[in-house]
A protein has these predicted regions:
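Conserved substrate/cofactor phosphate-moiety recognition/catalytic segment
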Residues: 24-70, 88-89
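A basic- and aromatic-enriched beta-loop-alpha substructure that forms the phosphate/nucleotide-
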Residues: 62-102, 125
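P-loop (Walker A) phosphate-binding loop of NTP-binding proteins
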Residues: 10
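A glycine- and Lys/Arg-enriched "phosphate-lid" helix/loop adjacent to the NTP-binding pocket
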Residues: 88-158
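Conserved lysine of the Walker
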Residues: 15
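Post-Walker A alpha-helix
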Residues: 18-19
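NTP-dependent small-molecule kinase module
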Residues: 135-196
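Hydrophobic anchor at the beta1->P-loop junction of P-loop NTPases
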Residues: 7
Length: 196
């Protein structure tokens, strides 16, 4: 079973861009969110009754990706992932009343069931950026966004709460507020951490 690295942070911080930059080194097998391909994402953006279906789809999709990455010949690298989808996005959607309390509980039960059979990532790379940077990056994205720039502070509070339960040696905080989009500095930090 191969190692797995999850890159986490709020929407717009640069998770997918960093994963793509790291993939160019040839050292990683990668998995991306694939917003456009997810069958309920656009529906959820238009109608909140698709929120539960969207979350269940993402949980299953991310679990499938983790299994594939664990079986790959290279270190696995995923943007976001199962844990971020539950601990942050599901809680955010509940706080915005896009999911009911029973729907949130169903998501928790499904997450716990899936995670019981899949080991957690060995390393979580948390991308940190000021809210202005996140808002600017989010505004230039050409994809479906359910999380909004104004959600960043609340999202980060959920992220901090979750990461407080993870052993500190498994979390690498990387400030990308002033990082260029080639992520040269961040790539070096991460490659050194995983000894590549």
């Amino acid at each position: 079973m191969n190692r797995l690295i999850s890159v986490v942070g709020p929407s717009g911080v640069g998770k997918t861009t960093l994963v793509r930059a790291l993939a160019q080194t040839g050292n990683f097998a990668t998995a991306l969110e694939q917003h456009a391909e997810r069958p309920f994402q656009a529906l959820f953006k238009q109608d909140q009754r698709y929120g539960l279906a969207n979350q269940i789809d993402y949980f299953l999709f991310r679990a499938e990706q983790e299994k594939e990455l664990r079986a790959a010949s290279k270190i696995g690298l995923i943007d976001g992932g199962l844990d971020l989808d539950f601990h942050c996005f599901t809680r955010l959607f509940r706080s915005r009343n896009l999911l009911s309390e029973p729907e949130h509980d169903l998501c928790r039960r499904l997450y716990d069931f899936i995670r019981a059979d899949l080991p957690r990532p060995e390393l979580i790379v948390r991308l940190v950026a000021d809210e202005g940077t996140v808002a600017a990056r989010l505004s230039t994205r050409d994809r479906i966004n359910i999380a909004r720039a104004e959600d960043t502070a609340l999202f980060n509070s959920f992220l901090e709460e979750w990461l407080a339960s993870v052993p500190s040696g498994q979390v690498l905080n990387v400030d990308v507020s002033h990082e260029r989009l080639d992520y040269k500095v961040s790539k070096r930090i991460i490659l050194e951490r995983v000894s590549i």
